């Protein structure tokens, strides 16, 4: 299984786990009739002082998770009844700075990269535009982006904004992500989605950053301005989210920001910068928990904030309700998980609708929020470390405490196991020893040249001092080649989608070069 496939499976499992809060037997509820319609009645009442009691335990939960995981920093906030009732920072922003430096402490105003928590935030930008009649969830993307296409000419004119915001276009999991790793820009990547095979339209769920980004670009085109400006104008500014942006440069310029830390050999280090500008609508938002409480309060209030209607309720509702099954049940008694437009939508064992989303940057961000509308409560947790399930564990334990008065699952193990699979290195030679007596390679000159590929661009093989390298992408990225056996070489690297320890083969065959890591969908062969 490739890293992208593992990531897709992890995303689905995390969403399913989030929707399965609590499985123990629940006490019998009152038989008094309710004035609410049956679909609005939960299976059990909340415990007395449910939210306050849950909040009282957050310090201990957060401290224990920080200590046991070793992650550098985390910030947590809770919204209830339209107010922020908890906001606190834990740990530090940068392990290379003194831990006792007050300026290095995480606080509620510290800005983190949100990764895929950007998706539901962006969905509320789209919902605003839908409410303004500037666009519809059903608007075909090609109506606003005439250059956009998918590989099936029958699907291209039909695929709508909502299809891409619910991951039901048929595009493969994480389509285009590796192009981003190589440094290609948004337009280049979106134009190459047309080369990818499609699963059946509107009945296949596959999580895509650049599919969703295409939809956001259509919304921005309809508004006549860049997505980043539109988000600021219609959402961040009206909500008073002064530390929130969809531009990486703004995050870089923040004095109070948490650096991303990657885990290598069990230790966290701020070794890489993650610039998500090409997929800004899907993963490029940076914010603080202070700012995010404004957004959570708005979602809980059906689009209203401080007496101002930011998003029309009828435009927001489709985003918060099921649009496709994302985690099918494996047996009749099991609850399925769903995806709305940018939101995970599930039902807990207390029969309460739960909205959520996680964000995950391998290079150093793990984020999560949970909203329980019927309890009028939401929680968000942001971390500056390779995803390991810590924010999800905290929010799941809090959700259990709110609904049941106790934690009912070993969420740390469930989420830890799910994320551990995503962190495994990729490549068929991982863990293998080189051949004891490899077949000799040809002279370096036999391999040198420029090999071309319509999807990935050029791969330029060069020789220096008898050693070969391959250069890819517009920067370019240069990978040193190590001989393995005959015409097979290897290279190692770390990117957002290639965890530490990843090894790719580079296999030469005459005028053809196949790069294993880039051979998704059998598209990794370059021709000289």
For the regions a protein language model found, what residue spans apply to each?
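Secretory targeting and sorting signals
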Residues: 2-23
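Catalytic loop of the DD-peptidase/beta-lactamase superfamily, centered on the K-T-G motif
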Residues: 20-87, 220-233, 237, 272-528
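Short, conserved catalytic-motif segment at the N-terminal edge
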Residues: 48-112, 131-136, 143, 151, ...
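Active-site helix/loop module of the DD-peptidase/beta-lactamase fold
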Residues: 57, 73, 102-104, 108, ...
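Short, solvent-exposed loop/turn and secondary-structure capping segments
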Residues: 87-90, 174-180, 232, 246-250, ...
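Catalytic nucleophile serine of serine hydrolases
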Residues: 116-117, 206-209
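Mid-domain, small-residue-enriched loop/turn segments at the edges of structured enzyme/sensor domains
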Residues: 160, 210-211
């Amino acid at each position: 299984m490739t890293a992208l496939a593992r990531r897709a499976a992890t995303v689905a499992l995390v969403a399913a786990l989030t929707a399965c809060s609590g499985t123990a037997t629940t006490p019998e509820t009152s038989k008094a009739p309710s004035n609410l319609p049956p679909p609005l009645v939960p299976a059990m009442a909340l415990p007395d002082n449910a939210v306050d009691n849950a909040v009282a335990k957050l310090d201990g939960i957060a401290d224990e998770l920080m200590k046991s995981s070793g992650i550098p920093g985390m910030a947590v906030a809770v919204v209830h009844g339209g107010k922020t009732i908890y906001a606190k920072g834990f740990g530090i922003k940068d392990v290379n700075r003194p831990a006792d430096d007050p300026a290095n402490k995480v606080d509620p105003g510290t800005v983190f990269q949100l990764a895929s928590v950007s998706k539901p935030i962006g969905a509320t930008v789209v919902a605003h535009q839908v409410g303004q009649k500037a666009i519809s969830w059903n608007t075909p993307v090609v109506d606003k982006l005439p250059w956009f296409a998918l590989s099936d000419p029958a699907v291209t004119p039909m695929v709508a904004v909502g299809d891409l915001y619910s991951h039901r276009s048929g595009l493969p999991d994480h389509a285009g992500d590796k192009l981003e790793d190589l440094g290609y820009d948004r337009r280049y990547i979106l134009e190459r989605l047309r080369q990818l095979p499609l699963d059946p339209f509107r009945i296949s769920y596959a999580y895509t950053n650049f599919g969703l980004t295409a939809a956001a670009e259509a919304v921005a085109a309809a508004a006549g301005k860049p997505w980043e400006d539109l988000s600021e104008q219609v959402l961040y500014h009206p909500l008073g989210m002064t530390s929130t942006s969809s531009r990486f440069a703004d995050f870089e310029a923040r004095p109070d920001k948490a650096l991303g830390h990657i885990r290598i050999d069990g230790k966290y280090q701020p070794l890489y910068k993650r610039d998500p500008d090409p997929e800004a609508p899907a993963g490029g938002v940076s914010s603080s928990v202070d700012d995010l409480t404004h957004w959570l309060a708005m979602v809980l209030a059906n689009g209203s904030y401080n007496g101002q209607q930011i998003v029309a309720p009828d435009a927001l509702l489709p985003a918060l309700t099921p649009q496709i099954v994302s985690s099918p049940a494996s047996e009749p008694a099991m609850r399925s998980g769903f995806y709305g437009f940018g939101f995970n939508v599930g039902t807990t064992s207390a029969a309460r609708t739960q909205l959520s989303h996680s964000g995950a940057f391998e290079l150093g961000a793990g984020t999560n929020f949970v909203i329980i509308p019927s309890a009028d409560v939401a929680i968000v947790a942001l971390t500056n470390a390779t995803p390991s399930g810590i924010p999800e564990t905290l929010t799941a334990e809090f959700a259990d405490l709110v609904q049941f008065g106790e934690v009912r699952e070993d969420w740390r193990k469930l989420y830890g196991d799910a994320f551990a699979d995503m962190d495994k290195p990729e490549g068929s030679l991982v863990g293998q020893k080189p051949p004891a007596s490899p077949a000799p390679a040809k002279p370096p000159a036999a391999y040198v040249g420029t090999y071309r590929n319509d999807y990935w661009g050029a791969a330029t093989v060069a020789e220096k001092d008898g050693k070969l390298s391959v250069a890819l992408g517009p920067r370019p990225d240069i990978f040193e080649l190590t001989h393995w056996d005959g015409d097979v070489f290897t290279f190692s690297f770390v990117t957002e989608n290639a965890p530490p320890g990843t090894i790719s083969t580079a296999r030469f065959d005459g005028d053809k070069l196949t790069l294993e890591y880039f051979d998704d969908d059998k598209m990794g062969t370059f021709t000289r």
